[in-house]
């Protein structure tokens, strides 16, 4: 019997927390919840309705990556074999974790495995997850792990070996982008991230319209990810950043999209003004157990 820690990061999770935590078999797995200073009744629900859950209440919002790092450190310190990252807006089927562990045991070169991520409201595969599957030509009729260059961290089974060597999430990413960076660091160690298409779970996120501020933020993180990718020497990463940035600026000019052009220019200037930090984080990311 493997020792599994299910890590859930909550923030104002009233609408999701019951479905999420009710899907975790707490007789078999330990639930570790990090609450990012919720202002609703999330903590009250956790304390009164889920006494078996291990709860850590933060006095400020730590962001996705840093909150998960608290759970990852706990897993290392307490002898767990696996960690399962479970978004507050996601939920499991009874056999989700068990099947993923079986697949990982058969294919230990996969350090992170995701189930097929479905979405009730969308009536099938979660939209963004479907994009990842299509890009990586995931075959839905196979019952073995299939390699992908990325899958979001809403539902991740992570081996403890991965956590020991790769470490935790990079704190340069407060929210969004941290899972991309984590996957890049797995690839740096020549291990795989995969999807097991005959294993199912649900990610019930709702995609809304992005504000201008959020678009600018995500543009910066996207470009930052290119520069922080330790699979490339810094000079190569810098040239890739320049190429991607210039190409998108030209596209924006051709389309008359001033927002795209301004976002790209702002992001590039912000990143280049902090190159020293980027170089430092690239160095740390190569180390064993980084950020933990």
PLM regions and their residue ranges:
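A short, conserved alpha-helix in the catalytic core of glycosyltransferases
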Residues: 150-158, 162-167, 172-200
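A conserved acidic beta->alpha catalytic loop
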Residues: 23, 35-44, 60, 90
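Short, flexible, basic/aromatic active-site loop/helix in glycosyltransferases
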Residues: 115, 130-149
């Amino acid at each position: 019997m493997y020792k599994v820690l299910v890590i859930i990061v909550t923030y104002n999770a009233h609408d999701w927390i019951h479905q999420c935590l009710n899907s975790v078999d707490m007789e078999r797995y330990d639930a570790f919840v990090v609450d990012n200073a919720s202002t609703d009744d999330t903590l009250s629900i956790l304390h009164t309705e889920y006494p078996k859950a291990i709860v850590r209440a933060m006095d400020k919002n730590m962001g996705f990556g840093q909150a998960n790092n608290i759970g990852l450190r706990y897993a290392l310190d307490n002898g767990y074999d696996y960690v399962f990252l479970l978004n507050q807006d996601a939920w499991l089927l009874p056999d989700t974790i068990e099947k993923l562990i079986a697949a990982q045991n058969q294919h230990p070169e996969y350090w992170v495995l995701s189930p097929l991520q479905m979405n009730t409201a969308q009536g099938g595969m979660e939209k963004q997850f479907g994009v990842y599957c299509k890009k990586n030509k995931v075959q839905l009729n196979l019952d073995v792990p299939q390699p992908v260059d990325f899958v979001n961290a809403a539902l991740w089974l992570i081996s403890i070996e991965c956590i020991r060597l790769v470490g935790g999430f990079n704190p340069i990413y407060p929210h969004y982008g941290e899972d991309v960076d984590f996957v890049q660091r797995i690839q740096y160690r020549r291990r795989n991230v995969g999807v097991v298409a005959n294993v199912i779970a649900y990610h019930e996120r709702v995609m809304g319209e992005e504000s201008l501020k959020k678009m600018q933020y995500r543009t910066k993180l996207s470009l930052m990810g290119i520069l922080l990718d330790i699979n490339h020497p810094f000079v190569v990463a810098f040239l890739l950043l320049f190429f991607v940035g210039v190409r998108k600026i030209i596209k924006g000019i051709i389309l008359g999209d001033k927002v795209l052009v301004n976002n790209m220019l702002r992001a590039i200037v912000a990143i280049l003004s902090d190159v020293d930090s980027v170089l430092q984080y690239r160095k740390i990311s190569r180390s064993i157990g980084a950020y933990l």
